[in-house]
UniProtKB/Swiss-Prot annotation:
Protein name: Serine--tRNA ligase
Keyword Cytoplasm: yes
Domain of life: Bacteria
Gene name as annotated: serS
Keywords noted in UniProt: Aminoacyl-tRNA synthetase, ATP-binding, Cytoplasm, Ligase, Nucleotide-binding, Protein biosynthesis
Length: 422
């Protein structure tokens, strides 16, 4: 959430930078609500100061009739204050609801653009393999090996659900454990295992609510949501807390299943594992000081890249433009993995700095020093990685002409020493 004072003092800048997202903000409504709030607040404070002053005078009055008259006047003032404060609460709630729908201001270094066509390729890693045979897409590989069952997945739950079996299930588990071990043992993240359902406050804190409720699975009868990403519960671990500056940066990693309606994806990626209602993901989350956040973003990005480097799978890093970054993000880098069966790069991780946008919504602050005034932290997160899409990348990049799939060396200890799925 943006700070109302920041918007007030930088109206033209905020409006111009939000327009680069392709979204306009009703600045006139903000000015009206903010002006009304400040006016009511001033009226309330003026009357409360008057009441306090007169109350002190009444205590010194010797004339009882005069004191009674002043008390009557103050009762009327108290009624005025009550009415003004009720109006103030109403306006503050309306302003708060408005601010919750305003996206984050893109960082000034974020490339300006309208869509993914304007994103900037930062670097590529690895050689795109030249195969001596026509590469298959992962769904054909998985079905041919009997490790992915799309038909039975649909029978169990409908479209965009998949049943993993045998070596497919074990490969998914191997990837999860490999990622967690890498991030905890070498990158020194603290592992978390959060609830897979969260309350409305969590969804509001990270920015999914109120604007994107249609893409969330909501539990009937109770006000819980299935998480769309571990970012939601892990970021909210410190909701409403004041952290020690000496503890920053705090780095968490969490494996969770993720649940998304994919409401706007009708007709997209209808085959395979790329776009599912339920999928596994290993998420990286950081809490940092404002001064350190963009340095930590590069570290987080590097940690996500390392997963693919050790798997020896080609990828590229893309910086998203203002028209393509998410609602809460100030800056985002995507990692896109090469998929031979589809002859293209596909997103496998999105690494973002949110500056204080989420922290302000969730009330996450820190003290730079022991007695210093609390400040909002900066939050960061990124996939490290999306597990299903990594499995897709393994199947397509390690496929062999005979239909088998070689197992990357780093995964073999997690696969009982097996070298091939056939």
């Amino acid at each position: 959430m943006l700070d109302a004072r920041y918007i007030r003092e930088n109206l033209e800048t905020v409006e111009a930078r939000l327009k680069t997202r392709g979204e306009g903000v009703d600045i006139a409504l903000f000015k009206e609500l903010d002006g009304r709030r400040r006016e009511l607040l001033q009226q309330s404070e003026t009357l409360k100061a008057l009441r306090n002053k007169v109350t002190e005078e009444i205590a010194r009055l010797q004339d009882k009739s005069q004191a009674a008259e002043r008390k009557t006047e103050m009762r009327e003032v108290s009624q005025q204050i009550k009415g003004i404060d009720e109006s103030l609460r109403s306006v503050e709630e309306e302003l708060q609801n408005f601010l919750l729908t305003v996206p984050n201001v893109p960082n000034e270094t974020t490339p300006i653009g309208k869509s993914e066509e304007d994103n900037v390729v930062v670097r590529t890693w690895g050689e795109v393999p030249t195969l001596s045979f026509e590469p298959k897409p992962h769904w054909e590989i998985g079905e041919g090996l009997g490790i992915l069952d799309f038909e039975r997945g649909a029978k169990l739950a409908g479209a965009r659900f998949t049943l993993y079996r045998g070596a497919g299930a074990r490969l998914e588990r191997a990837l999860i454990n490999y990622m967690l071990d890498l991030h905890t043992d070498e990158h020194k993240y603290i592992e978390m295992l959060p609830p897979f359902m969260v309350n409305r406050e969590c969804m509001t804190g990270t920015g999914q609510l109120p604007k994107f409720e249609e893409d969330l699975f909501h539990m009937e009868g109770v006000d819980f949501f299935l998480i769309p990403t571990a970012e939601v519960p892990v970021t909210n671990i410190h909701r409403g807390e004041i952290l020690k500056g000496s503890d920053l940066p705090i780095s968490y990693v969490a494996y969770t299943p993720c649940f998304r309606k994919e409401a706007g994806s009708y007709g997209k990626d209808t085959r395979g594992l790329i776009r599912q209602h339920q999928f596994n993901k290993v998420e990286l989350v950081k809490f940092t000081s404002p001064e350190d956040s963009y340095q930590q973003l590069q570290k987080l990005l590097g940690h996500a890249e390392e997963v693919l480097r050790r798997l020896q799978i080609p990828y590229r890093v893309v910086e998203l433009c203002t028209g393509d970054i998410g609602f809460s993000a100030a800056k985002t880098f995507d990692i896109e993995v090469w998929l031979p069966g589809q002859n293209c790069y596909r997103e496998i991780s999105s690494c973002s700095c949110f500056e204080d946008f989420q922290a302000r919504r969730a009330g996450i602050r820190f003290r730079p020093e022991e007695k210093a005034k609390p400040e909002f932290v900066h939050t960061l997160n990124g996939s490290g990685l999306a597990v299903g899409r990594t499995l897709v990348a393994v199947l397509e990049n390690y496929q062999q002409a005979d239909g088998s799939v070689l197992i990357p060396e780093v995964l073999r200890p997690y696969m009982g020493g097996a070298e091939r799925i056939s």
